[in-house]
Structure formats: structure tokens, C-alpha cells
Amino acid sequence: MSALVSPAVNSPRPMTNAELDRLSINCIRTLSIDAVQQAKSGHPGTPMALAPLVYTLWNRVMRFDPQDPIWPNRDRFVLSNGHASMLLWSVLHLTGTRAVNADYERLGQPAVSLDDIRHFRQLGSKAPGHPEYHLVSGVETTTGPLGQGVATSVGMAIAEAWLANRYNRPDFEIFDHNVYAVCGDGCMMEGVGSEAASLAGHLALDNLCWIYDNNHITIEGNTRIAFTEDIAARFLGYGWNVLRVGDANDIERIEHAIFFTRPRTARLSSFWIVTSAMARRISRTLLRPTASRSARRRSASPSATTDGQRTPNSWFPTRCAPISPPASARAARRPAPVGPNCLPLIARNIPNSRPRST
């Protein structure tokens, strides 16, 4: 665990942006794996692998007020692969999200305290193995059955589109929030997700973004055992804007992807494919493939080069944009919500963190 902790914690100088990002991400990771270890049950792989992605979404992209988690125009975050719930509990704790009861009354206490995380997956805990709606503030929907979360996110996007059409006026937008859903291989295998994706493409829901963690690992082994279809081609057929982001650990690359497929400018639902390098390393270790089998897999891959390395976007049609945002992309970032934003809160809740250097 000590290898995951940034050496900048004990440094006398102010932390740089990159160091603070790394410390925040590693804090999410270590909090998640400690909770799983304490419970002797759970799924640590996805929280470790997707911590950079979720940190980037919550810290740089989403509009969300931790002091008012029921703000009607907040961006929605759906963790469709709900077995990775420690990823969500860690973020809700570190952002300081406040609790709201069933009557939507603000209680003034943390939605997820450190003590709740200590009792992860225990009877009566506010940090169960799968997110449950109305039990914890910040949970937008119950996710357990794979595919259910992404399907529900389509309904959320439809609801926002209806509200915007009904209540918005020129130069006075009341509803313009977006819906972000994180999903995995299991969600892509489920029929309910395919049906919902088809509907979203038909309706051209430009306020919806699915982020697919393409880590090639299941509880039974590599996904090649039962799942070899071309996901990108499927979603292009649905009419989505498809983008291969690449390494889920590259937060700058993830943020750049926002400005190519950011909702309302892409005019289509967006589907990102990210690769959890950490999870894929675990997969290769568990499967222990021989050199000949690895070579055969690389040669059979439609996106493999002669040296066996994948070329980003090489198996996608030209409509999929590369990751090279225009210079004006950052200036086009949507405004922060009314009230305090969650941007600095993850770092603020990490012990011994120091202000960013200017």
C-alpha cells in the first residue's frame, strides 16, 4: 500500500497540480481496497482501475454540489457495474457530500462517513455492496443486475430532455444537466443495455454519455471466453458518437475526450471506450497465457501493429475523432453550478494535503 502513496505528502514545498491529482486518485484507491480488505468481501479491482476516470469526472467535468445533492439540475452519475460500489462510496466521502432523508430534508451530516466505510458490506451499513437508491445521498439509482444502470440512465436523459423542452426559455435554461454512466463488460453482455442503447440512439439523446470499461476480465477469466463482438461497431449502428479514449489512467486524455463528445455539442449520445490497464494486468497474470497464445491473439486483433501494440482508433471509422482537442476547447467548458462546486473537495478531505501551487 505504501507504494501507492504520493511522496509529495511529506514534501515541504506546495504540491503541483499533477501531484495533487495523483494523491487524490491514490486516496480513492487505497480507501476502496482497505474497505474491501476489512469486509473480507467485495470487488477491489474496478475501484482501483477506474479511480482516475471517476476523479476526472467528479473533479473536472460534472456539475454537482455536495452541500445540496438533490439540486434538480445536477449532473447524474450512474455506476452501472454496481459491484464496484466502493468507488462511489469513496468519492461521496471525499467530496463531503451531505445526507438527505427520504423526504429530501437536509440532515447536515455526511452521506457516507468513514465509519460507514469501515462497515462496508455489513448488515445495516450505509455502504452496501451495491448502491441502493434513497439509502444514501448521491446515489441516483439502484444498480445490481448488470445492464440495469445504463438502461436507467437512458430514462434519466429522456426525463431531462422533456423537462428542458417543457420549461426552458431562450437565454433562460432551467434544465440542462447531463447523465454519465460507467459500465463494464457485463453490462454490454446484457440485453437490457442493448435495448436502451438502441432507443437512446433513435432519440439522439445528446445529454447522455456511457463510459465503457473495456478491461477484458470477468470472474471466470478473459472475456474472450464468451464475448468477442465489436462493441464500437454495434454502437455506431445504434447512431451513437463512439470514441476510444484509451488508458483510463490518463486523466488529461479523459478530459480531452470530454470536449470532443461533450453532451449537447456532439448532437448524439456519446460512448467512450476506456481501457483499465491495471485490471488488464491482473487478467494477464491470472490467465498466464503462453507466448504462442499471446502472439496469436495479437495477430488476430484488428487493431494490432507489427510490434503487437494497439494503435488508438485504428479499428474505428473516420467519424470517430482522435484525441487532440482544439485550443478553444477548455474555454467552452460549461459554467459551474450555483453554490459551491465539488472541485477542491476531494483534496480538502485528504489528510496532510497542501494547496496547489500557482
What is each PLM-predicted segment?
Residues 26, 47-52, 82, 251-252:
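An alpha-helix initiation/capping motif
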Residues 50-203:
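Cofactor-binding active-site loop characterized by glycine-rich and histidine/acidic residues
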Residues 66-67, 135, 141-327:
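Glycine-rich ThDP/TPP pyrophosphate-binding loop and its adjacent helix/strand module
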Residues 326-358:
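Hard-cation-handling environments
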Residues 27-41, 213-215:
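N-terminal capping segment at the start of a domain
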